[in-house]
């Protein structure tokens, strides 16, 4: 896994039978002792380090914007916003491992010590698994929202999403425990590696299968199943003439809600597809390297670099997807990035707000509808508590004095007094 390896661009004397990790370059690089080759490797190591640093800066800025938008410009975050916040936080922390990787590539050795090696690798592993687990939970949430919108309404709330997100972080920390135990800088070596006990080859193979199953293929199976069921549901719904839960009078509101759900689903699908595109080469190359060891020649350094760089590029590209596919994030980015120019334009004569597209109007309408639903839910909970108070007051045989507040007394049924009864009889 890319989060637990820090390959060097220089040849090493590492014995693959004693210390190995899941990155293919954690083996001896063969007989590449020519001066020209060593010079080329040193230059490529510096260039690769610069690329890593650029990706790190862009990723930190982009994910910081996402976190700021969710926390600052979202008064009542939705379920999807909670999961995106945790995904952005994982991507942000994932970016912090790039400077260490860049330093090892530029210096051709790990200068930070064994303890820092273990810490950095463990943190990267936690954030890698948190990313895929968050995407899996988001896909399950999309399945519930589209296939079971009514039954899942009580569970698809922001507090439940926060609890699930906390469980995701805990599960990721448990999964990477082998990294904490076996990572470090081997004796006589200057690179950060996984140090397996004997038989090292068996341990290494088991770890690759373990990380690939839990960190990619298992979650990918769940994600594909969720979207397969979503496609089946959408196709069956389009064949119906009328939606059973939507009357013709409410058709515009129902259509807006469906369009909003489709946009959210499209954004989640795009994020998942990008994750698969960036991570699948890495896991496939690791599995191929177990079955048939790959050549350890400088000619393959470009392939190895691409395989390790793609996962970091994925964390860097997620904020760009949010900006293109989500109106809420687009508006949040505009407020932050275009705030000075907006003040200047607002002072110009005849300047006005930009025209909104149909999708933007739908999303604003959906936000208002969600806020109204939350207010109605709070009102129903209050009425439920008041009805329980009323039932408790009328359950006893002896009438009890009313001790509720004035607002509660107005909502409780009032019994007619004797004067009211007399006046009613006189009218009869």
Swiss-Prot record:
Feature: compositional bias, Acidic residues: 357-370
Post-translational modifications: Phosphorylated. Phosphorylation increases upon somatostatin binding.
Glycosylation sites: 18, 31
Keywords on record: Cell membrane, Disulfide bond, G-protein coupled receptor, Glycoprotein, Membrane, Phosphoprotein, Receptor, Transducer, Transmembrane, Transmembrane helix
Name listed for the protein in its UniProt record: Somatostatin receptor type 3
Cellular localization per UniProt: Cell membrane
Species the sequence originates in: Mus musculus
Topological domains annotated Cytoplasmic: 72-81, 141-162, 233-266, 326-428
Gene3D superfamilies hit by this protein: Rhodopsin 7-helix transmembrane proteins (1.20.1070.10)
């Amino acid at each position: 896994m890319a989060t637990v390896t820090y390959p060097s661009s220089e040849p090493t004397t590492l014995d693959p039978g004693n210390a190995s990790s899941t990155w293919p370059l954690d083996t001896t690089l063969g007989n590449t002792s020519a001066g020209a080759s060593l010079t080329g490797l040193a230059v490529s190591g510096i260039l690769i380090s610069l690329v890593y640093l650029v990706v790190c800066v862009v990723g930190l800025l982009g994910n910081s914007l996402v976190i700021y938008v969710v926390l600052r410009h979202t008064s009542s975050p939705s379920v999807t916003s909670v999961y995106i916040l945790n995904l952005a936080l994982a991507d942000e922390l994932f970016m912090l491992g790039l400077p260490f990787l860049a330093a090892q590539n530029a210096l051709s050795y790990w200068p930070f010590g064994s303890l820092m090696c273990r810490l950095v690798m463990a943190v990267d592993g936690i954030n890698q698994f948190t990313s895929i687990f968050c995407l899996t939970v988001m896909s399950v949430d999309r399945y519930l929202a589209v296939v079971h919108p009514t039954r899942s309404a009580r569970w698809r709330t922001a507090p439940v999403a926060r609890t699930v997100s906390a469980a995701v972080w805990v599960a990721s920390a448990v999964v990477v425990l082998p990294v904490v135990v076996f990572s470090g800088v081997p004796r006589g070596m200057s690179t950060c590696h996984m140090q397996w006990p004997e038989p090292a080859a068996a341990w290494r193979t088991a770890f690759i299968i373990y990380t690939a199953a839990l960190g990619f293929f298992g979650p990918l199976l769940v994600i594909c199943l969720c979207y397969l069921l979503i496609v089946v549901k959408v196709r069956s719904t389009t064949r119906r003439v009328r939606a059973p839960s939507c009357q013709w009078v409410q058709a515009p509101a129902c259509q807006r809600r469906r369009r909003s759900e489709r946009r959210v689903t499209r954004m989640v699908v795009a994020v998942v597809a990008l994750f698969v595109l960036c991570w699948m080469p890495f896991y496939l190359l690791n599995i191929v390297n177990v079955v048939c060891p790959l050549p350890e020649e400088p000619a393959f350094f470009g392939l190895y670099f691409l395989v390790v760089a793609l996962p970091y590029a994925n964390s860097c590209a997620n904020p760009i997807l949010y900006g293109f596919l989500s109106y809420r994030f687009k508006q949040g980015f505009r407020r932050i990035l275009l705030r000075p120019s907006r003040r200047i334009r607002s002072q110009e004569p005849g300047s006005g707000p930009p025209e909104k597209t149909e999708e933007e109007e739908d999303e604003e309408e959906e936000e208002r509808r969600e806020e109204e639903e939350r207010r109605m839910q709070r009102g129903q909970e209050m009425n439920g508590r008041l009805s329980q108070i009323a039932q408790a007051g009328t359950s006893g045989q002896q009438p009890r004095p009313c001790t509720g507040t004035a607002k509660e007394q107005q909502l409780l049924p009032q019994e007619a007094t004797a004067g009211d009864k007399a006046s009613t009889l006189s009218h009869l």
